[in-house]
């Protein structure tokens, strides 16, 4: 009798395990072209669970002071991991300011958002649950998307008829005021008032009642982006009654997408209505 009971318990344990592994059948696509600008392809990697609908989407934007880095760097979001969480996950490359002046990186992010909306039916994406995550310069870009949105920028790269809205963003170690940032001078458009252009591209100056929820993650000893940038951004969001969270780490340096950041991100998305 005891042997039969043990066998039954083992079967009950095994069945959920098998069902779980079957539910995690994932497709990963590399080097997908999400847009074209002046004949050059904008590339992304994507991952998603097969045969699912209503997937929240998350787009990762890499750091590198807008002049370096890539979607495949050591700090990049793992699209296969996030697909396993039940997301459509995307990591993007964007034009770097060494070859294309600002605001090229931001325009490419907006193109990626439109691509996701344009392909929502194809990949089973819930268009009302599109999220962004970035670290360092990528954190700046996603925060700008949450505050400024498309602004008056021209749509480039493609999908000009698609939606470009997002549900919320996560910025790890991102800068929010470019005119006071030590490397803010890298954000230099061609012609015009450079100071005004950097102010336009500073999320802290673009906060309105329409700003999307933002999770700010920063360490007190960040030498690349001083934590004062994050503190001031959180204060500005609070002053405008914008939903946000500020997670302040100690002695973590210039933060990347660590396991802790992933946990904070998933909790934040759940809190604002995602999965």
Where does each model-flagged region fall?
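Short amphipathic alpha-helix adjacent to the substrate-entry channel of hydrolases
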Residues: 72-91
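Primarily recognizes the serine-hydrolase "nucleophile elbow" in alpha/beta-hydrolase
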Residues: 111-183
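C-terminal catalytic histidine-bearing segment of alpha/beta-hydrolase fold enzymes
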Residues: 45, 227-275
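Short beta-strand/loop motif that positions the catalytic acidic residue
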Residues: 210, 215-218, 222
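N-terminal cap/lid segment of alpha/beta-hydrolase-fold proteins
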Residues: 22-52
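Acidic catalytic loop of the alpha/beta-hydrolase fold
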Residues: 177-178, 221-225, 255
């Amino acid at each position: 009798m005891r042997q039969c009971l043990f066998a039954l318990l083992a079967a009950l344990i095994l069945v959920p395990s098998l069902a779980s592994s079957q539910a995690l059948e994932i497709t990963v696509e590399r080097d997908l072209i999400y847009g074209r600008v002046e004949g050059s392809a904008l590339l992304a990697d994507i991952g998603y669970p097969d045969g699912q609908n209503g997937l929240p989407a998350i787009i990762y934007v890499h750091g590198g002071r807008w002049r370096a880095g890539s979607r495949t760097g050591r700090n990049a979001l793992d699209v296969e991991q996030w697909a396993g969480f039940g997301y459509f996950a995307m990591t993007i490359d964007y034009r770097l300011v060494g070859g294309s002046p600002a605001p090229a990186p931001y325009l490419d992010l907006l193109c990626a958002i439109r691509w996701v909306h344009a392909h929502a039916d194809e990949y089973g994406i819930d268009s009302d649950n599109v999220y962004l995550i970035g670290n360092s310069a990528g954190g700046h870009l996603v925060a700008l998307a949450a505050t400024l949105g498309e602004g008056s920028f021209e749509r480039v790269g493609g999908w000009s008829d698609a939606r470009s809205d997002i549900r919320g963003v996560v910025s790890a170690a991102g800068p929010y005021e470019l005119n006071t940032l030590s490397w803010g001078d890298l954000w230099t458009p061609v012609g015009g008032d450079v100071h005004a252009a950097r102010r336009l591209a500073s999320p802290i100056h673009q906060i309105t009642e329409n700003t999307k929820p933002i999770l700010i993650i920063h360490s007190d000893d960040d030498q690349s982006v001083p934590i004062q940038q994050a503190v001031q951004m959180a204060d500005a969001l609070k002053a405008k009654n914008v939903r946000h969270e500020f997670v302040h780490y100690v002695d973590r340096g210039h933060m990347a997408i660590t396991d802790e950041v992933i946990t904070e991100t998933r909790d934040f998305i759940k809190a604002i209505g995602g999965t």
